[in-house]
């Protein structure tokens, strides 16, 4: 809010002053103080006149048009009238001797009401000079009053009475009030649901505390509104809106109340605007603003939303308090008086005047100030003081023009200075002016004057200095105009847009529109313009091709248009009205031709006028004389997109595509990174014929097909042909056809329609473009018609398609003719055509058509001719032509046809033929039935049942054997047919339960069946069979009971079954029962320990099984069964390892010694005496574990050591044999030799080779298994018995025991099994293990 001026005259100081704005125009301000003078100032603070009075001014008022100011003064009976038009003062005698106290002009007409201190009234008609004195209107001083729009006058006086009079002075209403009234006003109040435009409600402040409401039509129901005492006195109030009242209270409260029924007096807004006091409230309906003053400040509220504070003006220098506020009618100026006698005038609303030239703008910043700025290019703003308050502003490249009425002042724009050039007077009131670099064009009264701005600038011919448009003989009226760098363009009421080329000084173009052109807006280059016609429709006009394009969704309220000044967005423009900005884009090159699209709209803030559009930023001028930039919602993508949601990004993508901003769209697509967005961008590129960019997008998408297609067409120069291809790519085929036909390659339209299979269109095009293609198109069209069921037209097109010189094509057409002839009922023609045709498929298809038409004979003939024997036989069957069926049967593969034929032959009693046919049809039940019932061949029937597992067939065979009395076979086939109950009953009746039990035990049978058999055997006291079937049905207790009752002849098998039973039952009671039995607790006869071992294994009690296994092995070893002992220990070792249970060291040691013994035989047999000797030494060192073979083992040890050269070892064991307990048991064959060794000892011995420990690399003898270095037990090789080596490691793939890779391979050359697990093995199955660390880790654990 800018202060325009302040008035502070010495004569006013110390006392409050009165002032009054001129109504309507607000050009004058009348002010008076205590100096007996009314001074009249203009709106810029310059004194224009004054009225001298005989005493202090009582009151003053302007008439409704602002032409006459009426003033009354103390000590005078005259009314002073100042004429604003003539600047003259006249006096009017009131004709009454009373001192005047009140004066007011009417709202309608020129009536002046004057009241006196004695209550008399004078109504003066200024137009007719008629005076109407009314005596005694009030009994005391008239203090206030108000006119309404129907010329009713309401008056209030000190007599506590309100009267309502007409313009003749007649009283039509009067009402008493409780206290002295003040501030009377008329308004339209809504006290009920009636809507009336008449001002029929009177309001007044009564006693400064109460608001009185009085309805003229309901005089008996006045309303008194009282307020809180804390608010203080009512200072002033105003009606606003739809029946609302705004009230200011002396203690600073600002209130809004409603007068709507039934909420009369309800507070709808309250604010403590001022802390200490409030002195005035003023309302501007034009601005929709309310102002309050107090506490040295003015606060301005927006009436739309009272909570919004529009502005605050502080007056720190006013320390005596503020006075009265008042707006001009147009809301431009707000005046404030103060208690010390000063007056301040503020600019609250400027006329929104501005102009732009490229990126330079000029706009009004004060009543007498224009600012020129170029924010885009960073030029500092220049302020220009002007001589008059302008009504138009124009800016050019080098000049500024301002003016009013018929005069314009021109200024030259320098770098940082503005120089006044000249002023020009035109022949009429100027509506608008436009500037060129050299010329100005002023529009006034339907004419344009084009003239040089600076005459000395150009050495122009005289006729080029100025020119008036239109010519004298042209009767049109110019409504709008514009100047570009080259042209003067103007539009007329007859609808013609003229282009005047300034350089050649002549017209170069005109366009005729059906109705008048009222506004036009060229783009910065002048190559396009938007114009608005008298119907308020908008169009884009291109003078280059003289074409116009209607602007879609063009609002009739549009005030103006701005083109985008950003050089990269040439086709974008906005149209604006008071509320919205609509963004449009003119797309010159699209596959649909040039067109205008609406890109979106943006809300325009209140009282903003757009001046300049640059890259989506709209610079607007405001009422306050400032500029404000808003960003179009259609250009939201220009902001930061860092944390934008995908939904918003997709919306931005749509905006960029509408505005053809493909680079921005590319960036958004990269952020979205989804195929849909890239596809939208690619489609838009095709639409705008941006082929290179479309290729780039398609390549990014990986759309190889599109890239290849676009690469092929990108070099096409024919616009229509290229557009046609692109339209086709976007599936707009009708448009593509039109474009192709308009191009220099119209046959492309035919090719497209053929590719799309639009045969009807293709035929029409072929007649004109390629008649030789008609037969080929006819054939394709016929195929499509046939598919849709239009056989008549299909036949016609097939016939048209026959060329006579293209065999393959003609065959297709003839096939079509054959099929369509049959479908049309011409069977003979169609069938003959099909029979003559070489195609098998045609014969099949025609046969199918004939079969559907119930023409079986012809159908079968065609099928047979086409070698479709199954179909032919099927149709012959429908004809009952069995002879033909028989002929075709060897060629028929369909079981269904064989079945039909078989049934027919069976009915005829020809069973051998029938059975063959049934076999071909895979109908095994029927085959079995015929073999049993008719051909008496049960062997064949049984064979088929066993082969096919047919349940029904098995039943039939069972019945057959039952009739023969062969119950065993009958039971077998009953079980096979799942008839277990019948089989059981039959077995029971004929004492064949063993057979039934054997059969049922091999089948997947239910527990009930097993239980039935078990119960039967239980009754028969056949314990083993009873136990077996109780086990199968899960009754473990009963099964165990029967197994333990078995006689001794079945003892071994029964105990095995008992162990299996307990293993499955996992019942501790049953386990203990069986253990007692095995230990001999029940019968005093302990059973073999192997059964206990098997029991523990079945129960998965591996530790107990291991202890038992050691005992068994020991017994076997003692008995000399070393292989058995080895196998028992090995199996237990493997089971414990599988269960990840630690191997007992005793078991591992025993297994190692037994295995060493087994290796002796292998190595001795192969002649490797050293390996045999080493293993025998290990065995002999543990000879106590071989008690039954001590002497033979020691003898073998002596012999093998001797053979291997281990003389000292041979001597040691020979000496052992010489002990008395062994000496006599030595085999006579070796006795002398051994005695000789002892008598003549040879202690020489080959030293045993040393190899590294796999754990610590300590060198120790190769047969030593305990490392002295790391104290670890080293794994031994199952092929040699030596300790393992890290770099020569393998293992048996079956048992997982380690072996030396090189030695195991040598062993397997002579042996075919693993020496440990006895599984078959060959050397190719061995794999050398390079990293044996995991095996060593297992050994350590």
From Swiss-Prot:
The keyword Cytoplasm applies. It is found in: Cell projection, Cilium; Cytoplasm, Cytoskeleton, Cilium basal body; Cell projection, Cilium, Photoreceptor outer segment; Cell projection, Cilium, Flagellum. The keyword Cytoplasm applies. Disulfide bonds: none annotated. Tissue-specific expression of isoforms. Expressed in the prostate, testis, epididymis, submaxillary and salivary glands. Expressed in ependymal cells lining brain ventricles (at protein level). Pfam families: Beta-prop_WDR19_1st, Beta-prop_WDR19_2nd, TPR_IF140-IFT172, Zf_2nd_IFT121, Zf_IFT144_1st. InterPro entries: TPR-like_helical_dom_sf, TPR_IF140/IFT172/WDR19, WD40/YVTN_repeat-like_dom_sf, WD40_rpt, WDR19/dyf-2, WDR19_WD40_rpt, Znf_IFT121-like. Keywords: Cell projection, Cilium, Cilium biogenesis/degradation, Cytoplasm, Cytoskeleton, Flagellum, Repeat, TPR repeat, WD repeat. GO terms for cellular component: cilium; cytoplasm; cytoskeleton; intraciliary transport particle A; motile cilium; non-motile cilium; photoreceptor connecting cilium; photoreceptor outer segment. TPR repeats lie at residues 736-769, 775-808, 840-873, 895-928, 951-984, 1020-1053. Transmembrane segments: none annotated. WD repeats lie at residues 11-51, 52-92, 95-134, 137-175, 273-311, 317-356. One of its GO terms (biological process) is smoothened signaling pathway. As component of the IFT complex A (IFT-A), a complex required for retrograde ciliary transport and entry into cilia of G protein-coupled receptors (GPCRs), it is involved in cilia function and/or assembly. Essential for functional IFT-A assembly and ciliary entry of GPCRs. Associates with the BBSome complex to mediate ciliary transport. PANTHER family: OSMOTIC AVOIDANCE ABNORMAL PROTEIN 1/WD REPEAT MEMBRANE PROTEIN (PTHR14920), WD REPEAT-CONTAINING PROTEIN 19 (PTHR14920:SF2). Component of the IFT complex A (IFT-A) complex. IFT-A complex is divided into a core subcomplex composed of IFT122:IFT140:WDR19 which is associated with TULP3 and a peripheral subcomplex composed of IFT43:WDR35:TTC21B. Interacts (via C-terminal region) with IFT122 (via C-terminal region). Interacts with BBS1. Interacts with TTC25. This is WD repeat-containing protein 19. The gene is Wdr19.
């Amino acid at each position: 809010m800018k202060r325009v001026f302040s008035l502070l005259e010495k004569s006013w100081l110390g006392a409050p002053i009165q002032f009054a704005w001129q109504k309507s125009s607000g050009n004058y301000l009348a002010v008076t103080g205590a100096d007996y003078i009314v001074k009249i100032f203009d709106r810029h603070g310059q004194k224009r006149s004054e009225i001298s009075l005989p005493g202090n001014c009582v009151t003053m008022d302007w008439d409704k048009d602002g032409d006459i100011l009426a003033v009354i003064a103390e000590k005078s009976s005259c009314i002073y009238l100042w004429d604003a038009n003539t600047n003259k003062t006249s006096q009017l005698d009131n004709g009454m001797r009373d001192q005047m106290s009140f004066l007011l002009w009417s709202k309608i007409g020129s009536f002046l009401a004057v009241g006196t201190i004695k209550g008399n009234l004078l109504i003066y008609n200024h137009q007719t000079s008629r005076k109407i004195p009314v005596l005694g209107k009030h009994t005391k001083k008239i203090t206030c009053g108000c006119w309404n729009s129907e010329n009713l006058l309401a008056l209030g006086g000190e007599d506590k009475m309100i009267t309502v009079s007409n313009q003749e002075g007649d009283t039509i209403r009067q009402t008493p009030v409780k206290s002295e009234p003040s501030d009377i006003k008329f308004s339209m109040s809504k006290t009920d649901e009636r809507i009336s435009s008449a001002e029929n409600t009177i309001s007044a402040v009564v006693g400064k505390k109460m608001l009185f409401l009085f309805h003229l039509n309901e005089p008996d129901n006045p309303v008194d509104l009282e307020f809180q005492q804390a608010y203080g006195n009512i200072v002033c109030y105003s009606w606003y809106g739809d029946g609302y009242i705004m009230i200011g209270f002396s203690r600073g409260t600002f209130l809004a109340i409603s007068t709507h029924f039934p909420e009369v007096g309800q507070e709808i807004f309250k604010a403590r605007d001022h802390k200490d006091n409030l002195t005035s409230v003023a309302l501007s309906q034009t601005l929709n603003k309310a102002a309050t003053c107090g506490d040295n400040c003015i606060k301005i509220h927006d009436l739309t939303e009272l909570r919004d504070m529009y502005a605050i003006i502080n007056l720190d220098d006013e320390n005596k308090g503020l006075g009265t506020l008042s707006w001009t009618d147009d809301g431009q100026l707000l005046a404030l008086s103060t208690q010390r006698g000063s007056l301040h005038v503020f600019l609250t609303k400027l006329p929104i005047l501005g102009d732009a030239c490229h990126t330079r703008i000029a706009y009004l910043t004060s009543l007498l100030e224009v600012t020129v700025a170029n924010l885009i290019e960073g030029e500092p703003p220049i302020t220009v003081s002007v001589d008059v308050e302008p009504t138009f502003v124009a800016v050019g490249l080098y000049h500024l023009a301002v003016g009013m009425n018929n005069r314009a002042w021109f200024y030259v724009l320098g770098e940082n200075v503005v120089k006044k050039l000249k002023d020009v007077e035109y022949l009429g009131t100027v509506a608008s002016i436009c500037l060129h670099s050299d010329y100005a064009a002023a529009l006034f009264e339907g004419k344009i004057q084009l003239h040089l701005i600076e005459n000395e600038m150009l050495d122009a011919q005289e006729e080029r200095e100025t020119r008036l448009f239109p010519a004298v003989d042209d009767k049109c009226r110019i409504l709008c105009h514009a100047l570009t760098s080259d042209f003067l363009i103007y539009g007329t009421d007859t609808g013609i847009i003229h282009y005047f080329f300034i350089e050649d000084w002549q017209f170069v173009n005109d366009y005729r529109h059906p109705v008048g052109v009222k506004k036009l807006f060229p783009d910065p280059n002048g190559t396009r313009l938007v114009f608005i016609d008298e119907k308020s429709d908008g169009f884009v006009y291109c003078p280059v091709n003289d074409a116009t394009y209607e602007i879609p969704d063009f609002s009739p309220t549009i005030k103006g248009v701005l083109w985008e000044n950003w050089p990269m967005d040439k086709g974008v423009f906005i149209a604006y009205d008071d509320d919205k900005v609509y963004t449009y884009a003119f797309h010159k090159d699209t596959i649909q031709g040039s067109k205008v699209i609406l890109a979106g709209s943006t809300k325009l803030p209140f009282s903003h006028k757009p001046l300049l559009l640059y890259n989506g930023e709209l610079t607007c001028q405001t009422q306050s004389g400032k500029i404000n930039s808003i960003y179009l919602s259609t250009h939201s993508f220009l902001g930061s997109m860092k944390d934008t949601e995908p939904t918003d990004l997709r919306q931005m993508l749509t905006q960029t595509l509408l505005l053809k901003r493909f680079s921005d769209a590319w960036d958004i697509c990269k952020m979205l990174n989804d195929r849909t967005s890239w596809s939208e961008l690619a489609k838009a590129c095709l639409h705008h014929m941006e082929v290179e960019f479309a290729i780039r997008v398609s390549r990014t998408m990986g759309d190889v097909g599109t890239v290849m297609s676009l690469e092929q067409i990108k070099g096409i120069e024919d616009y229509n042909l290229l557009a046609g291809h692109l339209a086709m790519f976007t599936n707009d085929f009708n448009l593509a056809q039109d474009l192709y036909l308009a191009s220099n390659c119209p046959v492309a339209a035919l090719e497209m329609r053929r590719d799309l299979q639009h045969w009807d269109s293709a035929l029409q095009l072929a007649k004109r473009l390629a008649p030789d293609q008609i037969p080929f198109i006819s054939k394709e069209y016929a195929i499509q018609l046939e598919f849709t069921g239009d056989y008549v037209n299909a036949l016609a097109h097939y016939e048209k398609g026959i060329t006579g010189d293209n065999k393959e094509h003609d065959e297709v057409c003839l096939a079509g003719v054959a099929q369509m002839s049959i479908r049309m009922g011409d069977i003979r023609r169609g069938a003959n055509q099909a029979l003559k045709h070489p195609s098998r498929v045609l014969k099949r298809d025609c046969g199918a058509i004939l079969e559907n038409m119930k023409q079986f004979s012809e159908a079968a003939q065609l099928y047979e001719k086409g070698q479709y024997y199954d179909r032919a036989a099927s149709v012959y069957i429908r004809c009952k032509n069995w002879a033909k069926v028989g002929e075709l049967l060897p060629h028929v593969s369909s079981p269904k046809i064989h079945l039909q034929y078989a049934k027919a032959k069976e009915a005829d009693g020809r069973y051998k033929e029938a059975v063959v046919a049934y076999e071909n049809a895979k109908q095994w039940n029927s085959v079995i039935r015929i073999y049993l019932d008719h051909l008496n061949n049960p062997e064949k029937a049984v064979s088929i049942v066993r082969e096919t597992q047919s349940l029904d067939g098995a039943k039939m065979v069972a019945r057959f054997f039952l009739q023969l009395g062969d119950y065993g076979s009958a039971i077998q086939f009953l079980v096979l047919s799942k008839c277990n109950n019948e089989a059981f009953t039959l077995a029971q009746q004929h004492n064949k339960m063993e057979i039934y039990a054997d059969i049922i035990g091999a089948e997947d049978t239910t527990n009930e069946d097993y239980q039935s058999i078990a119960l039967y055997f239980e009754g028969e006291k056949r314990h083993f069979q009873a136990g077996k079937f109780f086990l199968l049905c899960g009754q473990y207790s009963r099964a165990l009971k029967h197994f333990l009752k078995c006689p001794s002849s079945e003892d071994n098998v029964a105990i095995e079954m008992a162990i299996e039973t307990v293993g499955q039952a996992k019942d501790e009671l049953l386990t203990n029962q069986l253990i007692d039995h095995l230990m001999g607790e029940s019968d005093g006869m302990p059973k073999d320990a192997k059964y206990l071992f098997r029991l523990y294994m079945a129960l998965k009690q591996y530790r107990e099984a291991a202890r038992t296994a050691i005992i068994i092995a020991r017994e076997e070893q003692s008995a000399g069964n070393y292989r058995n002992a080895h196998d028992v220990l090995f199996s237990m070792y493997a089971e414990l390892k599988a269960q990840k249970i630690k191997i007992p060291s005793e078991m591992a040691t025993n297994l190692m010694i037994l295995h060493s013994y087994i290796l002796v035989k292998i190595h001795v047999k192969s002649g490797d005496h050293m390996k045999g000797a080493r293993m025998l030494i290990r065995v002999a060192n543990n000879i106590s574990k071989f008690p039954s073979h001590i002497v033979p083992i020691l003898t073998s040890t002596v012999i093998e050591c001797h053979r291997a050269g281990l003389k000292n070892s041979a001597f040691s064991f020979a000496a052992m044999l010489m002990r008395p307990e062994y000496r006599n048991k030595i085999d006579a064959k070796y006795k002398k030799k051994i005695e000789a060794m002892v008598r003549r000892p040879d202690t020489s011995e080959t030293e045993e080779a040393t190899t590294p420990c796999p754990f610590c690399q300590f060198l120790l003898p190769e047969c030593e298994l305990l490392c002295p270095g790391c104290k670890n037990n080293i794994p031994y090789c199952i092929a040699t018995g030596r300790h393992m080596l890290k770099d020569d490691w393998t293992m048996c793939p079956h048992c997982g025991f380690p072996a030396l890779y090189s030695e195991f391979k040598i062993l397997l050359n002579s042996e075919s099994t693993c020496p440990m697990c006895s599984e078959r093995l060959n050397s190719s199955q061995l794999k050398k293990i390079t990293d044996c660390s995991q095996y060593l880790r297992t050994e350590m654990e």
